């Protein structure tokens, strides 16, 4: 028996090819695509402007996958963490960061992560597998049933550039005018520093935003806290940032997790400025969110303010991120912190 095709794994051109293989006209693909993403159709029977015969054929050869949250935790600041159970028993999390008129959804790209960043709780769990295109898109579809989403950041569980074969089609679906209709200016892909994959991302999706998790200004420290630096050290990473095709006046976002006593001094701020001054950039300072068993600590308020002021005074665009969702383990670096506990049955 032939395995059915999940249509949410297909971009619009791929869906056109799929239906062409069934002898169908090209415009049928656009009809089906719109039903899936603009009407949230979960069955072919809902597609009332398509003939019964075509619906029956689709039913025989394809299906429309779906994700429903197993649990939703709401933080004191309104942040929501969604726990999604996957068909194979694995789980991933997404985080909705509410902001009046411009809600941001942080989505996952992998189950676990292979990068092993020392300050990230998700990184303490080994990579189990990549998410499919459908599983990435379905996180957005599920949360969008609750609230309007304006921004997508691929900063959840996993390293997006380690799964480009599924991430790139998912983003094409996000920004397709017949799909999720998100502006490419509102989609940001984050990486810990896979330099060759940055080149591929820029080539295949030149209009999305790039965020680079930098977190250190010397190879010595970055080697210690981010093992990927041993393969792609700062010089190679920053060269890839310079080559990334930024449209218009957009900038690379450098994410900088501030670790108390390690990378939060004025000397670090000075080195950061020297390293990045020839790259159009903005800096997100992220005070470290402590978790049980971690070896690092949060920076002091004084250290955060001094670092921020040094960069601002030198005309760097810099934002110190609030620790949104930390009370529900939904803050940066905390995903999967309460996953197992959340899934345990209560007596």
Curated annotation (Swiss-Prot):
The active site is at 93 (proton acceptor), 332 (s-methylcysteine intermediate). [4Fe-4S] cluster binds at residues 113, 117, 120. Its main location: cytoplasm. One of its GO terms (cellular component) is cytoplasm. Residues 99-327 form the Radical SAM core domain. Binds 1 [4Fe-4S] cluster. The cluster is coordinated with 3 cysteines and an exchangeable S-adenosyl-L-methionine. PROSITE patterns: RADICAL_SAM. Keywords: 4Fe-4S, Cytoplasm, Disulfide bond, Iron, Iron-sulfur, Metal-binding, Methyltransferase, rRNA processing, S-adenosyl-L-methionine, Transferase, tRNA processing. Pfam families: Radical_SAM, RlmN_N. It comes from the Bacteria. S-adenosyl-L-methionine binds at residues 158-159, 190, 213-215, 289. GO terms for molecular function: 4 iron, 4 sulfur cluster binding; metal ion binding; rRNA (adenine(2503)-C2-)-methyltransferase activity; rRNA binding; tRNA (adenine(37)-C2)-methyltransferase activity; tRNA binding. It is an enzyme of class 2 (transferase). It catalyses: adenosine(2503) in 23S rRNA + 2 reduced [2Fe-2S]-[ferredoxin] + 2 S-adenosyl-L-methionine = 2-methyladenosine(2503) in 23S rRNA + 5'-deoxyadenosine + L-methionine + 2 oxidized [2Fe-2S]-[ferredoxin] + S-adenosyl-L-homocysteine; adenosine(37) in tRNA + 2 reduced [2Fe-2S]-[ferredoxin] + 2 S-adenosyl-L-methionine = 2-methyladenosine(37) in tRNA + 5'-deoxyadenosine + L-methionine + 2 oxidized [2Fe-2S]-[ferredoxin] + S-adenosyl-L-homocysteine. It is found in: Cytoplasm. Specifically methylates position 2 of adenine 2503 in 23S rRNA and position 2 of adenine 37 in tRNAs. m2A2503 modification seems to play a crucial role in the proofreading step occurring at the peptidyl transferase center and thus would serve to optimize ribosomal fidelity. Belongs to the radical SAM superfamily. RlmN family. Reaction proceeds by a ping-pong mechanism involving intermediate methylation of a conserved cysteine residue. This is Dual-specificity RNA methyltransferase RlmN. The lineage of its organism: Bacteria, Pseudomonadati, Thermodesulfobacteriota, Desulfuromonadia, Desulfuromonadales. The gene is rlmN.
